[in-house]
Amino acid sequence: MKIIGDIVNAETIARGRGIREYALLITRYGGKNWIKRKGIATVEMDGVVSRAEVHWYECHGIGRVKMKVKQWL
């Protein structure tokens, strides 16, 4: 999966201990202030380009991790 361009309408879904995978994120990537976010992006997957709702986790100093497509638009 490759994100083409910017992610628009990004919003926070959960932060800190409100994230189900919070302990896993700290163990695997480090950091403390994790945020789960969602937004709309143009995604290229298997040579097909389409708009999709994507979800990801991010932390200051680490960046975006575990990005996944939740819904094709």
Report residues per predicted region.
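Cysteine-centric segments in proteins
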Residues: 1-73
